[in-house]
Amino acid sequence: GLAPRRGACQGEEGPLPSPEEPWSEEHRDLLHRLAQQSFAEAEARGVTGKALLWELQREAILSDLDAFLAADAELRDRFGVTPHLVEVRFGLPRSADGEPGLEAAQREIPGVGTLRFRGVADRGDLDLSGNLALVLDYKTGSASSYQALKDDPIDGGKRLQLPIYTLALQKSLGEEVTVRAAYWFVSARGRYAIFPPEPVEMAQVAERFDRAVGTIAQGIAEGVFPANPGSEVRGGFSNCSYCDFNTLCPSRR
């Protein structure tokens, strides 16, 4: 379960704060030291670009980190949770440091069978009673493309991570624990918002999830991959940005 592994989130600054407590100045100083180490490593690799722009970017990052600590304190207080796990691996081989992670998430999909899912969730929090878990998936960009989650937490099957994360942790924690999940935008650009505004439970989206995943799985099994480029955006189409074959498709797709 999660509770015995709380030490994974504890570092040289000692115990984590309780849900209603803000982060300490010691925690803030540690975060800044870690950031400075990352800055130095990036500079040593020569990937930081022009000096003036890099200086501005560094200041923006440090400002985001300070705001993150404040936003995190508000989030922990709102949901009554505190961090217990980071980089929650499930269904994957042992990590480089030998950490086994959690078992793969599984779900019986009507008409398809049992599907297994693997991945990594950024963070898992628990409340003090151990009866509520909150899984957070960090996002560093804009929240504009996530607005649809207000009405549909899986966006018509485009965003399936959150229910899968709840499956993975539910299996580890037990059915008596309520497991919720949300995307959290952890920068000024994303305004530190969470989406959906109320973290999602699998029970809320089970029917939609099963239908979407079932359609995807059946299509793969039958070799059906319909072209769906999405809406036209600057420089291409919304569904094609990360496709390896984007340049092979006709421009008037």
Whereabouts are the PLM-identified features?
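RecB-family 4Fe-4S metal-dependent nuclease core
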Residues: 1-253
